[in-house]
Amino acid sequence: MHDKWTSPELDSLLGSRTLTRRKVLVTSLATGFALAVQPVGAQTITTDSDGLTAGEVKIPVADGEIPAYRAMPAKGGNFPIVLVVQEIFGVHEHIKDVCRRFAKQGYCAIAPELYARQGDVSKISDWKQIFAEVVSKVPDAQVMSDLDAAAAWAVKSSNGDQRRLAVTGFCWGGRITWLYAAHNTHLKAGVAWYGRLKGQATELQPKYPFDVVADIDAPVLGLYGGQDQGIPLDDVEAMRAALKAADKSSEIVVFPEAGHAFFADYRPSFRAEDAAAGWAACLAWFRQHGVVA
């Protein structure tokens, strides 16, 4: 059950570098995920909340409520909305920082805790336990519903503009980004960071992005690493060909020297130049497709 998940996510944590003290701290994520909620090392980007309204909120969902992190400009209104979809490690400090980066660009950014019902991954010390007890038990249908609820809440409670809705996600959230673009017909655009494109279907997670190409309405920009050991380039090229054959306006960019999680500045897989280029491409994609002026 675990094999289909472990390669890209865990390999990107461990890497193959010589272990300095900082790198030992980074790789300890494999046995203690509490570290993922705090900045690690000089490469970690920290975005302040000056001029922002930022913090934890509660989102009403179909069966109650779930926690989320929300960041938006402190002044103004009618903000474009971006749903920020977590990595497998939940809504930790890196994901919150990404929300603040978007807020500095004028967005209302929301990262809902999509594992809230299944467990708190920051308190689980073993990665196999995370996959077995949490990730594998999160239904795609529930995730789609929660993202819809987060978007609706942003409109109602955070001055969000329902006509300018975007989504972006990383790793586990990259796959979700593609699926959400096939789910929500009101979505303006999406950016999927190294989300798995093909995989073994399960009852709770029945489809992968390659399976839903025909249903993708919103333009999605896929950002992938040419050295990703968990997402074969053959899969990336197959997805690109399928999008073209279906006459979709989505695009895929491959960074030749990057591996999995090249945007994650708290992990040894981080590549500053590719991360910066990917971020610029993400913002430009949203501008191009009318999320922001």
Regions found by a protein language model. Give the residues of each.
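N-terminal cap/lid segment of alpha/beta-hydrolase-fold proteins
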Residues: 43-74
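Short beta-strand element of the alpha/beta-hydrolase
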Residues: 78-87
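Gly/Ser-rich "nucleophile elbow"/oxyanion-hole loop immediately N-terminal to the catalytic nucleophile
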Residues: 125-166, 291
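Primarily recognizes the serine-hydrolase "nucleophile elbow" in alpha/beta-hydrolase
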Residues: 150-209
